């Protein structure tokens, strides 16, 4: 992986295998690997090769990262820990693929625009390349038991008024249903989440169009909660806790196509500044303000993503040679460097454990109570899961206070460190 210091970061599949227990202990139930396909001979030089996003062979592993056996071990070990594994698929551009798929399909490499950007310079033409990428999407599931895909610049597969994710997702769904009918546990989820960088309206007419994809990253939610992707001039929450109310409403209420789609909320990804960069290290509530953002993640209905290193408040501003789309690609580590990082890690693990064991956290119907306690602003989010009777409270405050909660009582909250309370345990 090419990083902001102008050098390789030397990460590999073995390093991920060695990190699985750490990831599991954070409360995660899935891993997204940025591209691991062979890019070692890709066009454009080593900086493009090292990103992984310009592959030269979709059916081989980049030797810098390891081998197919390493991937198989990683997937098997993740599954032993009840974690899914998602690969990163770049199905709209590549770095000079010349070999056919195992079934003999090829890519039409004509320089091609797309419905979002007719002047784009993708080098995958649809529908001519459709069979090739249907095979990529299904081959890794059927041969390596992966559980789904993160899809880079997914809008590039929307061409000539047609959303070709409809066919690719259909192929994945059919395979996963077949594998499930055969009694297989893994390689049956078929989760596919698209990167269609924009607001809800952009995604609706892009990868969600005509039911192509069912999940896409929630860029609008990310920027509202934790600030811009490629600037650090705002930490988000510019409208106070009202922005949290907005983020926790249903997809339709936030402008998405309908409530069957699944926006995926995140606070950092590999294309922008890290969450911690938006906060002043000298702020006495530096770590707690990040806890607030992670509490929003934990309370979000639908899928969420946590970027490696954010559990330790890793930063990027100190790096050199960085561009806005690579500053977050920093070297990973598995241990905190100070007590603040240790406390943040522990907080995240705790609230994610509560999310995992309380369905109200990830699918419950929310009620909101915005209030003032003296000079302190507070927000109470009550979430109830109808199927299990599970009920939880998430209480936010911008100062130390006791927040009066309807039908519960007073909740002591430290500034910017939300409390998550299980009011009623789920009955399954």
Feature locations, PLM:
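Short, polar loop/linker segments at the starts of domains and inter-domain junctions
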Residues: 2-15, 278-287, 407-408
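Conserved short secondary-structure transition element at the edge of the structured enzyme core
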Residues: 297-312
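A structural motif
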Residues: 28, 145-146, 213, 302-303
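Hydrophobic faces of well-ordered beta-strands that scaffold small-molecule active sites
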Residues: 31-33, 85-87, 149, 192-194, ...
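Active-site-proximal helices and loops of the catalytic beta/alpha 8
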Residues: 79, 135-136, 142, 152-259, ...
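Active-site neighborhood of divalent metal-dependent phosphoester/pyrophosphate hydrolases
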Residues: 268-274
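Substrate-binding/active-site clefts of carbohydrate-active enzymes
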Residues: 1-145, 167-172, 177, 202-203
């Amino acid at each position: 992986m090419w990083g902001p210091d102008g050098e390789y970061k030397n990460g590999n599949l073995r390093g991920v295998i060695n990190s699985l227990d750490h990831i599991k202990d954070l409360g995660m139930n899935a891993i997204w690997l940025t591209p691991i396909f062979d890019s070692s001979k890709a066009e454009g030089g080593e900086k493009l090769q090292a990103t992984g996003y310009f592959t030269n062979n979709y059916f081989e592993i980049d030797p810098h990262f390891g081998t197919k056996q390493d991937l198989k071990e990683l997937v098997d070990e993740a599954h032993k820990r009840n974690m899914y594994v998602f690969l990163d698929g770049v199905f709209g551009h590549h770095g000079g693929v010349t070999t056919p798929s195992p079934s003999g399909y090829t890519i039409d490499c004509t320089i091609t625009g797309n419905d979002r950007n007719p002047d784009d310079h993708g080098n995958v033409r649809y529908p001519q390349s459709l069979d090739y990428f249907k095979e990529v999407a299904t081959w890794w599931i059927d041969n390596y038991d992966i559980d789904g895909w993160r899809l880079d610049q997914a809008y590039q597969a929307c061409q000539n008024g047609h959303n070709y994710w409809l066919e690719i997702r259909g192929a994945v769904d059919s395979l996963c249903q077949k594998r499930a009918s055969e009694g297989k546990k893994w390689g049956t989820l078929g989760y596919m989440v698209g990167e269609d960088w924009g607001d809800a309206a952009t995604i609706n007419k892009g990868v969600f169009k005509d039911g192509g994809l069912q999940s896409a990253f929630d860029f609008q939610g990310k920027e509202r909660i934790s600030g811009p992707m490629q600037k650090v001039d705002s930490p988000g929450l510019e409208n106070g806790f009202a922005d949290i109310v907005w983020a926790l409403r249903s997809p339709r209420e936030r402008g998405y196509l309908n409530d069957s789609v699944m926006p995926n909320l995140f606070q950092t990804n590999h294309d922008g500044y890290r969450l911690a960069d938006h906060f002043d290290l000298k702020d006495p509530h530096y770590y707690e303000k990040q806890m607030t953002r992670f509490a929003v993640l934990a309370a979000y209905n639908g899928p969420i993503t946590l970027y490696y290193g954010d559990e330790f408040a890793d930063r990027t501003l100190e790096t050199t040679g960085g561009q806005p789309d690579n500053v977050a690609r920093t070297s990973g580590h598995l241990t905190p460097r100070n007590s603040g990082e240790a406390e943040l890690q522990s907080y995240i693990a705790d609230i994610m454990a509560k999310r995992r064991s309380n369905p109200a956290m990830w699918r419950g119907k929310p009620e909101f109570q915005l209030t003032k306690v003296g000079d302190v602003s507070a927000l109470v989010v009550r979430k109830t899961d109808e199927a299990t009777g599970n009920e939880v409270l998430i209480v936010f405050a911008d100062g130390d206070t006791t927040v009066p909660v309807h039908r519960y009582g007073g909740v002591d909250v430290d500034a910017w460190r939300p409390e998550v309370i299980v009011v009623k345990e789920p009955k399954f």
